């Protein structure tokens, strides 16, 4: 590529095509910036902006009040003893796995774990034992199967896994497993538990201590109304010295965090949205009620919701036989649904999906959810005679 003025134009300001749409994308509904975060994005957007008064450790910066956010607010919010800001939930998971295990050790993952949990384990050199789910239609995760998985690893390798992980909820079906029971089972074998709360921390009330988890991770850009990439990590007092150990070469730098993590706009938007994020978790019962109402509307049209029922999260997976049938009959049928929703200013179902898709109802409220449900119904009626 020749870097002349003409070719460089494509990399200037780019207008976002979907901005202003009703957004039902599970990746995005919990990450929409608050008004305060949008202001912070402009105010603190310059590179290392938060380092105007830095003594060498990001989480100890007092101006802006990152220290109080990380060491006072986050532990209370996450229900943990020590907390840090990271560059994302996956980076949080890797920090725990890399510090807790050595290459060749084993980790136990649930059968609905996110791909990044697998990749984090691989990067840390860990082997993986999977706790299977029960399959369709609910994909239930039996806490007792964690015990069996731990026993299997111990039998084959002579020692238990260094860590177990549960996804709370999973990113496919939005199932919320019995994490407290899973923690209890793991602790019977002296195996610590990591709670992957990428879709819960910032959306719903969740406390590592109440659940019994030794580690908790969250995603700022997925569920805490922050500009990404940014995440959070909470650790119990027992394991904090392991995960947050310091370098022998630079004595203030924590090894697993590579010294400092989210600098500038990411941490500042996370902080700016935090007051509103705390408040919105108190409205979780209403979010669940809205999700169930929406699911009921769709099932009345012939859609089939997979996963836990009654559902307890905004992320839901649907089978859509009506849409799929239409896609088999119309021109360029794979993309008809995307086109129809785009015309109605609705974004979030991936282009090409008609038979199965997931969506999120988080933060939309009954009025917008009604608009989406009405749109689905209108589309079905539009093609009912083809």
UniProtKB/Swiss-Prot annotation:
SUPFAM superfamilies: PLP-dependent transferases. The modification N6-(pyridoxal phosphate)lysine is found at residue 222. Pyridoxal 5'-phosphate binds at residues 89-90, 196, 219-221. One of its GO terms (biological process) is translation. It catalyses: O-phospho-L-seryl-tRNA(Cys) + hydrogen sulfide + H(+) = L-cysteinyl-tRNA(Cys) + phosphate. Its cofactor is pyridoxal 5'-phosphate. Keywords: Protein biosynthesis, Pyridoxal phosphate, Transferase. It is an enzyme of class 2 (transferase). InterPro entries: PyrdxlP-dep_Trfase, PyrdxlP-dep_Trfase_major, PyrdxlP-dep_Trfase_small, Sep_Cys-tRNA_synth_arc, SepSecS/SepCysS. GO terms for molecular function: Sep-tRNA:Cys-tRNA synthase activity. It comes from the Archaea. Its EC number is 2.5.1.73. PANTHER family: CYSTEINE DESULFURASE, O-PHOSPHO-L-SERYL-TRNA:CYS-TRNA SYNTHASE. Converts O-phospho-L-seryl-tRNA(Cys) (Sep-tRNA(Cys)) to L-cysteinyl-tRNA(Cys) (Cys-tRNA(Cys)). Belongs to the SepCysS family. Homodimer. Interacts with SepRS. This is O-phospho-L-seryl-tRNA:Cys-tRNA synthase. It comes from Methanosarcina mazei (strain ATCC BAA-159 / DSM 3647 / Goe1 / Go1 / JCM 11833 / OCM 88) (Methanosarcina frisia).
